[in-house]
Amino acid sequence: MVMGHYATALIPYAYNSQRKLAPFWMFLLAAQFLDFIMIAFVLMGIESLSPHQFFQASFLNMRVDMTFSHDLLPVLGWSVGLAIFAGIVCKNVMATVWVFSLCILHELFDLAVGFKHYIFGPNTMAFGLDLYNTQPIIGIIIEALVCFSILTWYLKKRSDQGEPVSKNVKIGLYAILVGATVGLLPMANQPLSHFLG
């Protein structure tokens, strides 16, 4: 899951529009933290992502080793660590709980939509539906529906709070979260190089 993780940051923000709990960037960081760790580990050679060239990658042919960033035991450690960081920065227990929850939610959504993960390493039990490698179109459609549902709920919540979001911001949010996800459909089974010639 890609944009769906960003969408989850809107859940605590709906209850925090006055920034009393934490700044929005803290929720965005928590929602995507595991992927940021993965990218850093791939760049350092600790984890791997193939094919290495972006235009050669499709969801169907993509292979990942995310042992230290996305396997279940490391995720628990990263979630606790980031939650402690949030508690120190925000000095707020609820911010700590939300940050921990967003990290765990990231993993749960990945298990439902993205690649399979293990307890800790490929020699341990695997979890997840692995839709990106088996049924990527279904995975992307589910992610788009998740983005649409969270965003629609968020906009209604803000309106109910008497703080409606402007029309332009609504359009922008739907375009970024839902539109960008739907825009991944051509890459489900074929790499971009197939379409570019």
What positions do the PLM features span?
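N-terminal membrane-targeting hydrophobic helices
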Residues: 1-197
